[in-house]
Amino acid sequence: MKSQTIPTRRVRGFRRAAVIRQLLSRDKTPLTILLLASLTGVLAGLAGVAFEKAVAWVTAHRIEGLAQVAHIPWLVWLLAFLFSALLAMVGYFLVRRFAPEAGGSGIPEIEGALEELRPVRWWRVLPVKFFGGMGTLGAGMVLGREGPMVQMGGNIGRMVLDIFHRPDAEARHTLLATGAAAGLAAAFNAPLAGILFIIEEMRTQFHYNLISIKAVFTGVIMSTIVFRIFNGEKSVIEVGQLTDAPVYTLWLYLLLGIIFGAVGPLFNRLVLGMQDVFARIHGGNTTRWVLLGGAIGGACGLLALWEPAAAGGGFGLIPIAAAGNFTVGMLLFIFIARVVTTVFCFSSGAPGGIFAPMLALGTLLGSAFGMACAAWFPQWHLQAGTFAIAGMGALLAASVRAPITGIVLVLEMTDNYQLILPMIITCLGATLLAQFLGGKPLYSTILARTLAKQEAERQAQADGRNT
């Protein structure tokens, strides 16, 4: 009896496996794409949670180590530099040695991959981006985790595609976009912003059709569910419930948008210019590049010890600044300090994003503007926090040129949907002036520079073979 049961079970198992293989091998099967998109979303969500916990673990141990010697002033300063320098050097070395495409934000790499202009080598990008990001973000460098999550999410999508042997180009494109959107959603607990980011920021690369958009929706839903299982459903940035902006104050938000419209292109020029400076300093030499990264990381460690608000990604700073706990002068000082540290950290090629630092910069300048307006117009009883929220999305809109994503992202992260009108006005003003001043979207410009460098290297190799 048992000898008959075992073969019968095996036959049934083989039949199920054959049905699954047949389903997955059918070309242009929407159900298959949606199933793979679901798996991509789950894996991207798990990667997002793991990355967040890993960075927090490294940061906590670094701070705990410094606390052990807090009673010895000279030693705590020395160790603050050394701990952060060593962590940063790990990140820089991993990128330079094993996966150069994992440096920086990673979002331009995904944009290039969607156009089949940049390769996706998930087997090396995923570990390098994860552990390299643990080093640089754990060191206290002014970087965010959203860029790494977008790149890791996109690479997870390609990994799923390769595992299940889907050779068609449309499936490759769809799962890459799905993973990127799921990664952003998992980084910020912002599902709608993840969807809009693909549609708006990657509008020139994304193939918008019914199947692809359903896949993006599915992946984002799954990654957000995974995020909320581990982290709960509360907003990522808790600034409290702010009051709505009266109609007669809306012109102030337009003025704030104009300010950010001037700041955005200037910020982009600083980033791109500093990238050129760093390229000239290290000249492609790995040792110089890693030592330079260690010096920047160590400086961030010292800065975090002296003024914690000036270092780190900035998520912890945003609620404090929005609550009006700083003076206008202090807000402007921290803003300038963080502009410098953001530009240095991001332009150096460290594995880390720039979304979170830009959100913090927008909060600082917006809060300073709001406090100044509250002093100028005391009869209106203005709340500086509303300007801080508007500023969060405005710098993103002016720099990245994705105003809708900036608006929705901030509203989802802060749970202040009643501020949608002042947010729209501020982001529109910022985008229009940035465009009028000739500013180019940051990620598109970085991608163009990467492609130009790639073409120059290919040409040099071709010339070398011909000689």
From Swiss-Prot:
Keyword tags: Antiport, Cell inner membrane, Cell membrane, Chloride, Ion transport, Membrane, Transmembrane, Transmembrane helix, Transport
Annotated HAMAP family: CLC_ClcA
Motif Selectivity filter part_3, chain ranges: 353-357
Keyword DNA damage among UniProt keywords: no
Residue intervals on the Cytoplasmic side: 1-30, 99-106, 115-121, 165-174, 200-212, 280-285, 348-352, 437-467
Subcellular location(s) per record: Cell inner membrane
InterPro entries assigned to the protein according to its UniProt record, in alphabetical order: Cl-channel_ClcA (IPR023861), Cl-channel_core (IPR014743), ClC (IPR001807)
UniProt record similarity statement: Belongs to the chloride channel (TC 2.A.49) family. ClcA subfamily.
Protein name: H(+)/Cl(-) exchange transporter ClcA
Source species of the chain: Cronobacter sakazakii (strain ATCC BAA-894)
